[in-house]
A protein has these predicted regions:
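Hydrophobic h-region of N-terminal signal peptides that target proteins for export
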Residues: 9-17
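Transmembrane beta-strand segments that form the barrel wall of outer-membrane beta-barrel proteins
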Residues: 93, 308-310, 334, 338
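Extracellular "leader-to-stem" segments immediately downstream of a signal peptide or signal-anchor
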Residues: 1-3, 16-107, 113-194, 199-201, ...
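Right-handed parallel beta-helix
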Residues: 111-113, 148-157, 196-207, 219-233, ...
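Short, intrinsically disordered, charge-balanced linker/junction segments flanking boundaries
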Residues: 340-343
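Short, T/G/N/S-enriched strand-turn elements that build extracellular solenoid repeat scaffolds
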Residues: 77-81, 96-104, 211-217, 261-263, ...
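Residue-level marker of regulatory loop/turn positions in helix-turn-helix DNA-binding domains and
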Residues: 182-184, 192, 215, 242, ...
Length: 343
């Protein structure tokens, strides 16, 4: 029997507004353990403290929004890493790219628009994590694996450019109603794995072809004041009811100590999703794991299927708090998606 224990939903506002209650000096999780002071700190990362800034157009990336410049942008990331780290800056303008891989000591600051290619060939097949299993699948637009202190920041936009991918999905689904999420080949927007002390702040994360943000086997991860959006209708002319399929806002997969604070989420699927693995032997597979100590607060939801969803690839979820949030059009505040094949 799956153990989903000690879930607390406190001060969830469905309509209108509510007075914020004064918090106790020492906060606790639902099981009575003391909440670490890390969760009280919503201070933004000071980009100036992250080291030298590498403005991509100063290092060979052109001001041309019509050509895919993956190689040139990746070269800037690689140079920053060789030089000891720093901030890769996307300036004003639109820059088209495929999969980018960040390295230890490098960070991403977006002022303009970093836009994903509509060609799946620009996203290599790699060993990754998707839908509760470790397998070969396409890299995301922004990838960070095994990093300590990685930061995405800025008032700009990371745009997945998903329309082509969404339309292909609905064409496949109309031809074959059994078409799965992975049958339609689509990249995610951001994928952070095996990392710690990660902050994603202020940035606009929009139009993801697949899941918008996916964080796996990581700890002490913060999403602060992000704007996360994918259309919920009118992406496929034969059926205007169709939106961006499987565009979850934030998928938290086998992670501990995650905070989502002050974010806006409007997507054609679930908002914050807890995942961990699937299958008969899911709890025996070392690539799977629990989600523990997850705090979601001060967020606003537009149209979403579930504000907080557990599953369907979920194992043991403990000490989860959703509080002081506002929803306009959510189908559900809390949704349990149970799988008969998973203990």
């Amino acid at each position: 029997m799956r153990k989903i224990i000690l879930l607390l939903l406190s001060a969830v506002v469905l309509t209108g507004s509510a007075k914020t209650k004064k918090r106790p000096a020492v906060e606790t999780w639902p099981d009575g353990t003391e909440m670490d002071g890390w969760f009280a700190d919503t201070t933004k990362v000071d980009v100036a403290s992250l080291g030298r800034q590498y403005i991509i157009t100063d290092y060979g990336v052109g001001h041309d929004s019509t050509i895919v410049q993956t190689t040139a942008i990746q070269a800037v990331i690689d140079r920053a890493a060789r030089d000891g780290g720093g901030v890769v800056v996307v300036p004003e303008g639109t820059f088209l790219t495929g999969a980018l891989v960040f390295k230890q000591g490098t960070h991403l600051h977006v002022k303009g628009r970093l836009k994903g290619s509509e060609r799946i060939a620009d996203f290599p097949v790699v060993m990754t994590r998707i839908e509760g299993e470790t397998c070969k699948y396409f890299a995301a637009l922004v990838n960070a694996d095994g990093l300590d202190g990685f930061t995405i920041s800025g008032q700009g936009t990371i745009d997945g450019n998903g329309l082509h991918y969404w339309q292909e999905f609905w064409i496949r689904r109309s031809w074959n109603p059994q078409c799965t999420n992975k049958d339609a080949q689509r990249p995610r927007l951001t994928y952070v794995s095996n990392s710690k002390n990660v902050t994603i702040q202020d940035v606009r994360l929009v139009n993801s072809p697949f899941w918008t943000n996916h964080v796996y086997k990581s700890d002490h991860v913060r999403y602060l004041d992000c704007y996360i959006y994918a259309p919920t209708e009118n992406v496929w002319s034969p059926d205007p009811r169709r939106g961006a399929p499987s565009s979850d806002a934030i998928d938290i997969d086998a992670c501990t100590d995650v905070m989502v604070n002050g974010c806006f989420m409007h997507v054609n699927d679930d908002a914050v999703v807890l995942k961990g693995g699937k299958g008969t032997w899911a709890d025996k597979d070392e690539t799977n794991g629990d989600c523990e100590r997850i705090l979601i607060q001060n967020c606003r939801y537009g149209r979403v299927h579930g504000c907080l969803t557990l599953g369907s690839e979920s194992l043991h979820d403990r000490n989860i708090i959703l509080r002081n949030c506002y929803t306009e059009r959510a189908d559900r505040v809390l949704w349990f998606k149970m799988r008969p094949d998973t203990p």
